[in-house]
Swiss-Prot record:
Record has Hydrolase as a keyword: no
Upper classification of the organism: Bacteria, Pseudomonadati, Thermodesulfobacteriota, Syntrophobacteria, Syntrophobacterales
Catalytic activity annotation: K(+)(in) + H(+)(in) = K(+)(out) + H(+)(out)
Major location (coarse): membrane
Family annotation (InterPro entries): K+_transporter (IPR003855), K_trans_C (IPR053952), K_trans_N (IPR053951), Kup (IPR023051)
Job description of the protein: Transport of potassium into the cell. Likely operates as a K(+):H(+) symporter.
Keyword tags: Cell inner membrane, Cell membrane, Ion transport, Membrane, Potassium, Potassium transport, Symport, Transmembrane, Transmembrane helix, Transport
Designated gene of the protein: kup1
GO CC, alphabetical: plasma membrane
Region (Disordered): 1-38
Transmembrane segments: 48-68, 85-105, 139-159, 177-197, 207-227, 251-271, 286-306, 324-344, 384-404, 405-425, 436-456, 458-478
Organism of this sequence: Syntrophobacter fumaroxidans (strain DSM 10017 / MPOB)
Location of the protein in the cell: Cell inner membrane
Biased composition (Gly residues): 1-11
Name of this chain's protein: Probable potassium transport system protein Kup 1
Length: 661
């Protein structure tokens, strides 16, 4: 698959994500501090499980705020009669069981890439060369994964808006006077949330787990109290009620299923955040706390509706005693902020992975914690999300309006994940197609049914995440193909490094004191920046370093495998530095490591040479003209290599070059 190389340099397109990765257990947070048989010590496991409550389960944990409400009081609501209430509860129970407990907890979390999860980690497990997978299948898998990643951005725009709105809508239950305050309050909370991102969340993040623990305990208690008063609601455990619901409502039942899907939004976060906490703590927190708390609250809302159908306008807050309404609104608002924070941090992480894998241009990546590699802030993404999230609140003005847009992205991503999982299981792990197809087919039956039910709400807001995904896929595909075209140009116009070194050895080239570091997109060709430097200045430095950054198909690269150095003669050294797709390369740190290990001589001063490309979209490239112009625009506005690679600006020399493509 062409074009799969990092924006700042890397391997040729044909070799990217190409090596076969055997499925094996790697270090992950759950076994860093281990007891017997690799199981974490009890204290460590409980600490990770508590942390997972705050990061992994914020989204799905706040779904009770709006799921039942949307079924019985939304745009396509049904009457809150006993048969419908029991049918909806049965659908919620079995959706959580089949999709979250079985698909994600039991199967998807086995597909870890050295402990990491998520769509890009899953894609990186698929072999991209050889006879294990056909060329057409590779193209389908890559495009599916890119679409899945793009859909996550659409989901990321909606989650903060709908969770914050639904939380503070409890004020309407307390007093009618609060109705006009909902939108301004939601906008103010979102504005504050995005403005504090640049300061990092390491300190405040420590309270996320305890707050969500209180949240789950509270919603479970509220639900249990109602169930005790009306235990008949427990009969909805039987799937017969779900069957009767569809038998009675037919197509309208599918529309309501699109609202039931809101109960599983956030389920994909279990897999995506696996690298932060490990599969054992995530499973523990799900089965010990989250799953039972959600079921108790949903069934409690159902029990309350059986007693008072007029609570349908906001059944969640209908469970709360009036004297506790304001404290509950405050707790729900904190839970919604935590859910939003998890989504924002996930968008930052996803963007960094996409940059490293060469799917989007370089962006500004700020590390907000000296201790934690994953604590990052990306101002470009933060500004975009802030504008879109506040815009959604101003346009839709209520959680019920946004509910139509929510779910489409999640269910489409779930279906895509199932497809990629099939290729990982059959091509990487060696599972037989005959055994894998029925399992994945079962997943897809649920995924496609949920996705289809949400498409029925296309004109009620479902178009929004799909439009966002389409734009992002176009950007990623154009950037990938554009970088591939530039690589072809470099291959055609640059001599091999061996040829250049032969010329240097034959001529008495004047050398100046110091070290010159040239960034090279491939280790076999002469960097264009070196060619232009030598062409115009007619000199070389005493020591010349050719530095290539390789991004691997693994999340991280061990320090011992980071740097490979080769002495080329004539004062030239080649350094190949390998990074995982969840890491950010820092060139001065690479050089310091090489100096400390005495792999290259340290000759001062050090200058860094970069190529500054001016793209002219009028060349022979096969890309469509509008895609060429888009690629040129993205290239002009991408983060500079100086900032992205952490280079000291006073030591950087940029050499311009025009490229027609």
């Amino acid at each position: 698959m062409k074009g799969l190389f990092p924006a700042g340099g890397g391997n040729p397109p044909s070799s990217y994500l190409s090596r076969f990765l055997p499925h094996r257990k790697e270090r992950s947070p759950e076994n860093v501090t281990s007891g017997r048989n690799g199981v974490p010590h009890r204290g460590r496991m409980l600490s990770l499980a508590l942390g997972a409550l705050g990061i992994v389960y914020g989204d799905i944990g706040t779904s009770p705020l709006y799921t039942i409400k949307e079924c019985f009081h939304g745009t396509h609501a049904i009457a809150p009669n006993p048969a419908n209430i029991m049918g909806v509860l049965s659908l919620i129970l079995w959706s959580l069981t089949m999709v979250v407990s079985i698909k994600y907890i039991t199967f998807m979390m086995r597909a870890d890439n050295r402990g990491e999860g998520g769509i890009f980690a899953l894609l990186a497990l698929v072999p991209m060369s050889g006879k294990l997978i056909s060329r057409g299948a590779r193209a389908v898998v890559v495009m599916a994964a890119l679409t899945g990643a793009a859909l996550l951005y659409g989901d990321g725009f909606i989650t903060p808006s709908i969770t914050v709105l639904s939380a503070i809508e409890g004020l309407e239950v307390a007093t009618d006077a609060a109705k006009n305050l909902i939108v301004p309050l939601a906008c103010g909370i979102l504005l504050g949330l995005f403005l504090v991102q640049s300061r990092g969340t390491a300190k405040i993040g420590r309270i996320f787990g305890p707050v969500m623990l209180v949240w789950f305990a509270t919603i479970a208690t509220l639900g249990l109290l109602c169930i005790v008063r009306n235990p008949v609601v427990l009969d909805a455990v039987s799937p017969v009620y779900a069957y009767r619901f569809f038998a009675e409502h037919h197509v309208h039942g599918l529309v309501v299923l699109g609202s039931v899907v809101l109960s599983i939004t956030g389920g994909e976060a279990l897999y995506a955040d696996m690298g932060h906490f490990g599969r054992v703590p995530i499973r523990l927190s799900w089965f010990a706390m989250v799953f039972p708390s959600l079921l108790l609250n949903y069934f409690g809302q159902g029990a309350a509706l059986l007693e008072q159908p007029d609570l349908a306008f906001n059944p969640f807050y209908g469970l709360v005693p009036r004297v506790l309404l304001l404290p509950m609104v405050a707790l729900a608002t904190m839970a919604s902020i935590i859910a939003s924070q998890a989504m924002i941090s996930g968008a930052f992480s996803l963007t960094r992975q996409a940059v490293q894998l060469g799917y989007i241009p370089r962006v500004t990546i700020v590390h907000t914690s000296a201790e934690t590699e994953g604590q990052i802030y990306i101002p470009e993404v933060n500004r975009l999300m802030m504008v879109v999230c506040i815009g959604l609140v101003l346009v839709f003005r209520a959680s019920s309006g946004l509910a139509g847009a929510y779910g489409v992205a999640v269910t489409a991503n779930m279906a895509i994940t199932s497809v990629v999982y099939f290729f990982v299981a059959t091509r990487t792990w060696g599972w037989s197609t005959a055994k894998t197809a029925p399992l994945v087919g079962l997943f897809l039956v649920f995924d496609i049914t949920y996705f289809g039910s949400n498409l029925l709400k296309f004109f009620d807001g479902g178009w929004f995440p799909l439009a966002v995904a389409l734009v992002i896929v176009i950007v990623m595909a154009s950037w990938k193909d554009g970088r591939a075209e530039l690589y072809k140009h470099i291959v055609k116009s640059s001599p091999t490094l061996d040829m250049f070194l032969e010329d240097v050895s034959r001529h008495n080239v004047h050398r100046v004191a110091g070290t010159a570091v040239f960034m090279a997109s491939t280790s076999s060709l002469t960097p264009p920046s070196l060619m232009h430097h030598f062409k115009h200045n007619k000199v070389l430095h005493e020591e010349v370093i050719l530095l290539t950054i390789e991004v691997t198909h693994t999340p991280q690269v061990p320090a011992a495998e980071r740097i490979r150095v080769e002495e080329l003669g004539e004062g030239f050294h080649r350094i190949v530095a390998r990074f995982g797709f969840m890491e950010t390369p820092n060139v001065p740190q690479i050089m310091d490591s090489a100096y400390r290990a005495r792999l290259v001589p340290q000759v001062l001063p050090v200058s860094y040479y970069l190529g500054r490309e001016t793209l002219i979209p009028s060349g022979p490239s096969r890309m469509m003209p509008w895609r060429k112009r888009l690629f040129a625009f993205l290239s002009r506005n991408s983060q500079s290599a100086t900032n992205y690679f952490g280079l000291p600006p006073g030591q950087v020399v940029e050499l311009g070059v025009q490229i027609e493509f």
